[in-house]
Amino acid sequence: MSWMQNLKNYQHLRDPSEYMSQVYGDPLAYLQENTKFVTEREYYEDFGYGECFNSSESEVQCELITGEFDPKLLPYDKRLAWHFKEFCYKTSAHGIPMIGEAPNVYYRAVWVMLFLGCMIMLYLNAQSVLDKYNRNEKIVDIQLKFDTAPFPAITLCNLNPYKASLATSVDLVKRTLSAFDGAMGKAGGNKEHDGEKEVITEAPTTPAPTTKPSRRRGKRDLSGAFFEPGFARCLCGSQGSSEQEDKDDEKEEEMHETTTRKPFNINDADEEWDGMEEYDNNEHYENYDVEATTGMNMMEECQSERTKFDEPTGFDDRCICAFDRSTHDAWPCFLNGTWETTECDTCNEHAFCTKDNKTAKGHRSPCICAPSKFCVAYNGKTPPIEIWTYLQGGTPTEDPNFLEAMGFQGMTDEVAIVTKAKENMFAMATLSMQDRERLSTTKRELVHKCSFNGKACDIEADFLTHIDPVFGSCFTFNHNRTVNLTSIRAGPMYGLRMLVYVNASDYMPTTEATGVRLTIHDKEDFPFPDTFGYSAPTGYVSSFGLRLRKMSRLPAPYGDCVPDGKTSDYIYSNYEYSVEGCYRSCFQQLVLKECRCGDPRFPVPEGARHCDAADPVARRCLDARMNDLGGLHGSFRCRCQQPCRQSIYSVTYSPAKWPSLSLQIQLGSCNGTAVECNKHYKENGAMVEVFYEQLNFEMLTESEAYGFVNLLADFGGQLGLWCGISFLTCCEFVFLFLETAYMSAEHNYSLYKKKKAEKAKKVASGSF
């Protein structure tokens, strides 16, 4: 039919009251009895319900959509059906109105299939979009910033952690070094003695004319030697004349072998023993007012090579000798009362000390000196060793538990023994920070000269002391976090330049190289010189060129970095989080949990204690935990992520010999001639330069590759492509849900009121 017939039927809607009464009767009748209602579809007979909306007349549209037809008067189920039909005709989503307005079943079926197909495609593409979003992909943006980069903090350490002259006064260190000497002696076997035999075999067979047999004692080798004062039985005066004659013959033979004789000088390390053996007792004796109660000269050197295994019988044969545990040498020896306890200018790694040294600087070391001015480091706190007791029992006189704790048993490789000895030096953790700082190098002793940006540094103010468990006292330049230092230009002249002095003559026997250790880090980060440091040798100018890269990482869910700050178990308080610090914290927590004490190399939380380095049980537990973690970085027990913000310094190292022969100037506090100071600093000093190679730095910034905005754009595109749905269309569905929920609640509330009224009515009728 034409739309005019529809308008004719529409006239029935002009009077709503009459229409509702005519079609539905009483609106509330459905609550009282089952009444068959005439639906809109039946009313319009053969006309499609949607055809009424095809009229282009604005008045008709107004009446149909907004006007006088009230769906609230319909029964609940009919009202819902009417509401859904209204939504189908009015929604802006594609396909749904075509299904609702379909003139027949076939037409509707085609549109249903098309709609379902589009929904399937929408699902597949939407799933792909969501998967891409859930992958949390990120991109790295690299920018080159042409700006002055902040200068890093520089931590400087001496490769020798503690002064041998002072550290050997600590009983535990002394015992550790003694065990180390014993292990080195066993590992080396009789190599030195075999070498002497080879020399004798290759020597000319024609003996020199002599009136008595020659008993040549080989020259003592300083490598590995370590002197300490010890009591021994000796032969003095006429008792030791035969040995003295042998010694004179030995010195006479050496005179034929050596044309030039030099006194001992710490500036000439290769000849230091020559000077020690060439002293002349008569030239160095001083007039001590000592009464010779036994008829002998108490200032005279005594002999103990034949008697050192025997216990002294009295005052006349009780001497103090310079004893070396590794070679069992006891020489020189003088009567007990002739040694003088005093202070020496320098003491080297062999505990041999000298007085009145022109190149010496800093504090003096306690020592004990013989009348010949042969001096040995000695603090006087522990009595000298009894040599006869030591030699009769050998190294086993040491506590077996202590030897086991040191871990030298069964070791035959000298390099491994030295490494183990370095590890054992964490025994110093039993001392307070103040004591460890006192035993180590001071900043004034290590840093002689310093400049930054071409201007002199204030060594006391610009360097902060930091006690490291491996390197002792270290000193950090640019430690003030409130001051931002920058280089005004690139190149070594505008960076940090330091003249350092290591005093190699006072090195520990466990220190293998002379020089300094340099660590470059952010001032907020804890320095780890044993892991990230660079070594700079003496006798060279070491140039470290820097390039800075700043990393900015995304936290979860895009990345796996740790936000600014530190984790709860981080043991390096007042410092920012780092991966190395995390691993060490994890290891320390594991040790504290299973060993009931902490590794002495790392800090412990408040209330915890460090393990005793001499306790074999604690050492076994520490070694077991180390093996469990595969070193310090066992990933299966410790999970440490990168920090979200990090500064990475790339270092380029280049050395050159230093000082040059033309550098004829007084360096540091050297009081000798320019040539002597030049040679002295070549063995004990170094020049260190740290600078930026370019005044720019890289910024590496992570950002999300596919964010929420991208998700909305792609998802909205898929909705529009396959279903023609926009954000407003989604709002239509939301309102549809809210309206149907409201109608359901309203209907249930009406039923509730009806039941309540019926119940009240029954109660009222029952009371009459």
Swiss-Prot record:
Residues 243-252 have a biased composition (Acidic residues). Glycans are attached at residues 336, 357, 480, 484, 503, 671. The chain crosses the membrane at residues 110-130, 719-739. PROSITE patterns: ASC (PS01206). It is a multi-pass membrane protein. Residues 203-212 have a biased composition (Low complexity). Probable sodium channel subunit. May be needed for mechanosensory transduction (touch sensitivity). Negatively regulates the turning step of male mating behavior. The channel is probably composed of at least the mec-2, mec-4, mec-6 and mec-10 subunits. This is Degenerin mec-4.
